[in-house]
Amino acid sequence: MDIVQSSIDTLNHFYEISGVEVGQHFYWQIGGFKVHAQVLITSWVVIAVLLGSATIAVRDPQTIPTGGQNFVEYVLGFVRDLTRTQIGEEEYGPWVPFIGTMFLFILVSNWSGALLPWKIIQLPHGELAAPTNDINTTVALALLTSVAYFYAGLAKKGLGYFGKYIQPTPVLLPINILEDFTKPLSLSFRLFGNILADELVVAVLVSLVPLVVPIPVMFLGLFTSAIQALIFATLAAAYIGESMEGHH
């Protein structure tokens, strides 16, 4: 009987784990619209963290940077080098703020899933998680990137920008048009899938072995989250550079 009862308890435990829900959402009703409140709340927190950190770090700038100012200048230099490499020496300047904002928002959003105690905030439906854990956020970021590289191409070449769709031959017109749809799709689903999978793996491991085992996985998740932010920012800059250069 003890063996049977133990087996039943084990099955019940796995049943509870399988009940982890990823589709429950908390909405605010504003007029005739439903607003996805979870994403807004966590996104506002991430934005507040970024603005607060930047304000504190540079509130008393020094000629020889130290501490927070030194870190901010290092990040700025990293983003500037990344943007210059992908867009080019002559055109990269105006795009540093955009690429830097994308990189930092995605990085802090990804890390917030592991470093911020979202679970202690109870909602009527669903639960708070990293903003990039939601497909709405990643699609919005990808669409912003699409708007950016269309704007970059049109600002540089005018209507001649659309000539790229028939290069090197008009036969490739459908494929070149399709490419503009696949870019935001790949950007959004790559980021969403990686962050969601990471948080689900950690949640399951914490349910199974709540002490030591999840810690290395969490550190691995922080590393992969940083890589995903870097990949997104690099591809965004590459697409913008490509639209201004007019070649693939």
Curated annotation (Swiss-Prot):
The coiled-coil segments of this chain are none
Q: Which NCBIfam families match?
A: ATP_synt_6_or_A (TIGR01131)
Organism field: Cycas taitungensis
Family membership: Belongs to the ATPase A chain family.
Keyword Chloroplast assigned to the entry: answer is yes
Q: Which gene encodes it?
A: atpI
Give any Gene Ontology cellular component: plasma membrane
Q: Where in the cell is it found?
A: Plastid, Chloroplast thylakoid membrane
Query: Which molecular-function annotation in GO is an example for this chain?
Result: proton-transporting ATP synthase activity, rotational mechanism
Sorted UniProt keywords: ATP synthesis, CF(0), Chloroplast, Hydrogen ion transport, Ion transport, Membrane, Plastid, Thylakoid, Transmembrane, Transmembrane helix, Transport
Q: How does it assemble?
A: F-type ATPases have 2 components, CF(1) - the catalytic core - and CF(0) - the membrane proton channel. CF(1) has five subunits: alpha(3), beta(3), gamma(1), delta(1), epsilon(1). CF(0) has four main subunits: a, b, b' and c.
Please name the InterPro entries in this protein's record: ATP_syn_F0_a_bact/chloroplast, ATP_synth_F0_asu, ATP_synth_F0_asu_AS, F0_ATP_A_sf
**What role does this protein play?**
Key component of the proton channel; it plays a direct role in the translocation of protons across the membrane.
Q: Check the record and name the PROSITE patterns matching this protein.
A: ATPASE_A
State what protein this is by name: ATP synthase subunit a, chloroplastic
